[in-house]
């Protein structure tokens, strides 16, 4: 808000917080270079390693920043075509379900639901973030569930088990 530069370590799941997600969506904050931190040293010299002597693993952490990181200007090479593959459509929202970033089609103009892990690969010049799947207005509900995205399996609605981010390709056919 006050235009100061920052670099903060936070839990991966912070992306699911409304305030954090909105900052990412508005390009006011993004992930830094490190893909995932599972060990680091604290000021007092204490080391948090991937596994401590008791065998437990610290939670996955990310760098959250508004500092310029060059990878954000790169492009994800998209090799899939919507014409060559059948993508699941949502039962209650006009978009297709994408299971992995590598499966994003280069020739699809509509909205797509991608896993929340997409944020670590997000390129703002290539993609537009529409919103989180749990908060966009649905076309219909199933069993009173107004938040979840559903696909259709065997003729019946099937709940998507994990949060989805809805995106749109700004550069259709430019893979």
Residue map of PLM features:
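Class I S-adenosyl-L-methionine-dependent methyltransferase catalytic core
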Residues: 1-175
């Amino acid at each position: 808000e006050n235009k100061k530069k920052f670099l903060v370590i936070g839990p991966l799941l912070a992306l699911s917080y409304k305030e954090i997600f909105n900052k990412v969506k508005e390009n006011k904050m993004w992930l830094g270079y490190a893909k995932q931190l599972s060990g680091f040293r604290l000021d007092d010299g204490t080391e948090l390693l991937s596994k401590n002597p008791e065998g437990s693993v610290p939670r996955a952490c990310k760098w959250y920043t508004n500092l310029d990181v060059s990878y954000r200007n790169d492009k994800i090479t998209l090799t899939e075509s919507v014409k060559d593959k059948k993508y699941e459509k949502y039962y209650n929202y006009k978009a297709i379900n994408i299971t992995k970033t590598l499966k994003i089609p280069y020739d699809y103009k509509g909205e797509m639901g991608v896993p929340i892990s997409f944020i670590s690969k997000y390129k703002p010049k290539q993609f537009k973030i529409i919103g989180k799947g749990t908060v966009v207005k649905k076309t219909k509900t199933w069993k009173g569930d107004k938040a979840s995205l559903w696909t259709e399996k065997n003729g019946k609605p099937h709940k998507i088990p994990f949060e989805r981010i809805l995106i749109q390709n700004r550069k259709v056919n430019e893979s």
